[in-house]
């Protein structure tokens, strides 16, 4: 049986570029061990956005070679080319975190190219990455969320005092301020009073045009891995215990060694009710957002009340050596290599289902 051609896309014009490189190295290593696919590692430069075909995914960013003779051309309706040679890609595994990778852009382009894509589709990606619109949708399905307010930059500067008053009255201090479309806790800060809120909001606007402000609470941070298309597998949740940080920010996630300031507990220490509720909310969230392939759904449990809240959805979760997504799957018996292989299979299955639905010859006759 001939091997399929798999393109692994990583890097990207994104604040999460460096995390993508680490995730790509893990996935590439797993795919090499599987030896089931012809691999085409494709790197997107952070500054120029140029796509380069690489020989492999190096374990250090400085080893990436930007060879002008290996620039990738993408032509909808024709194919993916390097030096006029069609690579004949059968499936793409995008591991670009944040903008262009998780917002539906790559997914939409690959749909136009008629190439199967690992992970969520256009709609699920676009909604999930935008914290504000995602919360509005989940709220309409009565999924529990931390009290929040969202607004665009234009509206804020049009009525700054009105929005600040609304935050104080509706949420009360302290509050946590987030750019709507960034992951890895980039651009997030906490405001404890009227003086700080303005600074926090304006800092968040440096990253995005929409900001979400949430009530800040003392919480437990629970994460849940989910994979599947029509049939969904929900894995045993894990807990992140943050010891030396106010919340699980970028430094806590990627600049510390697990076991020092951050401890991963898999499984999370939950009573049966909380365990079942979290799995149910994970299932409902996955379905409401029309996700497929994979997602990591993050939860908060308020320490004072024990109430559960859905926090964020990651349609392309981290695959680094310290990422929770694969570790939770591994706890339930699905090792890293098998997880990666399953995700590629799910992409082919989803593509085949979509092609069945869109049978133009049958519909037109």
From Swiss-Prot:
Residues bound to Mg(2+) 1: 298, 312
Domain ATP-grasp: 135-345
Primary location group: cytoplasm
Metabolic or biological pathway: Cell wall biogenesis; peptidoglycan biosynthesis
GO cellular component, one term: cytosol
Swiss-Prot/TrEMBL GO biological process terms: cell wall organization; peptidoglycan biosynthetic process; regulation of cell shape
Binding positions for Mg(2+) 2 per the UniProt entry: 312, 314
Cofactor detail note: Binds 2 magnesium or manganese ions per subunit.
Key word Nucleotide-binding present: yes
EC numbers: 6.3.2.4
Reactions mediated catalytically: 2 D-alanine + ATP = D-alanyl-D-alanine + ADP + phosphate + H(+)
Subcellular location: Cytoplasm
Pfam families attached to this UniProt entry: Dala_Dala_lig_C (PF07478), Dala_Dala_lig_N (PF01820)
Keywords, comma-separated and alphabetical: ATP-binding, Cell shape, Cell wall biogenesis/degradation, Cytoplasm, Ligase, Magnesium, Manganese, Metal-binding, Nucleotide-binding, Peptidoglycan synthesis
Binding positions (ATP): 168-223
InterPro entries: ATP-grasp (IPR011761), ATP_grasp_subdomain_1 (IPR013815), D-Ala_lig_Van_CS (IPR000291), D_ala_D_ala (IPR005905), Dala_Dala_lig_C (IPR011095), Dala_Dala_lig_N (IPR011127), PreATP-grasp_dom_sf (IPR016185)
GO MF terms held by the record: ATP binding; D-alanine-D-alanine ligase activity; metal ion binding
Cofactor: Mg(2+); Mn(2+)
HAMAP family the UniProt entry points to: Dala_Dala_lig
Record-stated family: Belongs to the D-alanine--D-alanine ligase family.
Protein's job: Cell wall formation.
The protein, known as: D-alanine--D-alanine ligase
Source organism of the structure: Borrelia hermsii (strain HS1 / DAH)
